[in-house]
Amino acid sequence: ADRAMARHLARARGRVVNVSTARVPGANFPTVTADLQAAAKLAIEHLLDQGFRHFAYYAPMNLSFVEDHHHSFVKLLEERGYTCSLLHAPGGKRPDKQWQKQQKALERWIRDLPKPVAILTWTGRRGREVIYACRALGLSVPEQVAVLGADDDALLCGTCIPPLSAVALTSEQIGFEA
């Protein structure tokens, strides 16, 4: 979303409601989105119930709503006496050579994390990258490295081996109800 789109929507007939977690500078539309703090809390409760005591977060940090989710996750962990390691994922699409370079950096990061560890990722795509890195390192998922996505893309989650678990943000339902 950008300013040109916001201007176009402001001139449109009818009501405009932003159902995206993305914020458009200068746009003043009513916004209805998923509760990212509640999603982070659900993730933490699930991971603690599974016995994990080491936590990490892997996501592109160039988007304000991802930063909000990360900060909620870290704050809630700290309130419970835990810390969280962070690896910034690159944003946008990457040529193959850049992907391979980033994947190696991801492998190094995961290798150095205390085990067992639970890694929360912003998207299923990032979760898949973590699962690939674990496979390359010979680490078992979810026994040594649990991977939990922050969005429930059923197709992507189901095609990962092993399947990726995710927190359902109910974004589609929010859009219909708005």
Task: Go through each PLM region and give its residues.
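Bacterial carbohydrate/catabolite-sensing allosteric modules
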Residues: 3-178
